[in-house]
Amino acid sequence: MYNFIIILILFFTIIYCYKCEGIQFNDPGMKYFYKKNNIIYDKKRQLLIKNNKIADISNGLNGKKKYTDKNSMKKIFLDNGIPTSKWYIWNTNLPNSRNLEMLKLQNLNFPLVIKPYDTYGGVGVITDIYDFSRLMRIIPTISKTTDAIIIEEQVIGDTYRIFVFNNIILDIYKIRKPKIVGDGKSSVMKLLKKYINDPDVKLTKAQIDYDLIKKQGYNINSIIPKNKKVIITNVCNSTVGSEPLTVNKNNIHPANIELFKKVARTVNLNACGIDYITKDLEIPYYIYGSIIETNSKPGIKSYIKNNPNVIHKLLNNIKFK
C-alpha cells in the first residue's frame, strides 16, 4: 500500500511538472503589464484571468515530451523535413574506444560541438572541437555529469532565438557571443575569473575557448585595452552571458518565417523558443541554416529588457475564454 501511494504521488508530481511547461509569466517585469491590463496571474495553474475569463498560458500536456532530449527532438526534425545538423550519441556506459570507432563511422565534419544529452540553456556546451584528440580530452569531464553525450557538427554562423506564441512570431533576436571588456589594467585571466563568478552567468571554465581568445591577439596574461571587447566562447545563450539584439523581421527571408512556424507546430508547443543558426537570415534555410533546438519554457526577461513592445504583442495574442 505504501509503495502504491508513493507511485501515485510521483505520477501526479510528473503531471503537474508537465502542466507547468510554458512561458515564464512569473518574470518580475510582467507585474506592471498585469496591473495595467487588469490581469491576474495564477502561477500554480499557469492561467491568466481577466474579466472573469481565463487563458491557459502553459503548454498543457503538450509538455509531456521531454524537450531536453536532444536525440528525440533531432529525429523529429529530420522526420518532418526540418534542417538540423548531423549528430552522434556518445554512450558513457560503453568504452571510449568503441564510441570513438562508431563516431568515426558517422563521418561528421569538423568542427564539432559537444553537449550533455538532456540539458538546455547552454549548460555544459563546448564548441570548436577541431580534432579527435581534443574531443577525447573533453569527454571524461562531460561524462561525470551525464549518461550520454550528444556530439554534433557545428554550424558556422550567428545564433538567433525565435519567440513563437500561438503560431505568431512575436520577436526574433540575434544572440551575441559572450565577451569580456577590457579596463586597461586587468589581465584576461582576471577578467575571465570575474565573468565566471557573476551569479547571473552559468559559464564554466571548460567552456572558455582560449584558442578563440588567442585568434583575437590575446593570451591569459594580456592586458586588454579599455573598452576593447574580446569574445570568450562561441556558446550562445542568455544563461552564459550572451546579449540579445532585436532583429528587423522585414530582413528575414519568408521561407525562414514559415520554417519557424512549422517547427512550433511540429513540436506541438503553444509557447516556443527556437534556436537557429545561419550566416544571414536573408538566406533561405534550404540554402543555409539549421535548427539547433527548441525550448518549451522560454523565459521572457531578456525580451522585456530589449523590447517592451513584445509584451503587448504577447498579451494581444492570448485568448481569454
Segments from the language model and where they lie:
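ATP-binding N-terminal substructure of ATP-dependent carboxylate-amine bond-forming enzymes
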Residues: 2-68, 72-75, 93-97
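Residues at alpha-helix termini
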Residues: 28, 37, 80, 106-108, ...
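Aromatic/hydrophobic pocket-lining residues that form π-stacking "cages" and hydrophobic walls in ligand
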Residues: 30, 101, 260
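Short acidic loop-to-beta-strand element that houses the catalytic metal-binding Asp/Glu
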Residues: 32, 47, 162, 275-277
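Generic non-transmembrane alpha-helical segments
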Residues: 33, 76, 80, 259-267
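Active-site nucleotide/adenylate-binding loops and adjacent lid/helix of ATP-dependent enzymes
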Residues: 48-207, 253-257
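A long amphipathic alpha-helix within ATP-dependent nucleotide-binding catalytic cores
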Residues: 192-282
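C-terminal active-site "lid" helix and adjoining low-complexity regulatory extension at the edge
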Residues: 238-251, 265-271, 278-321
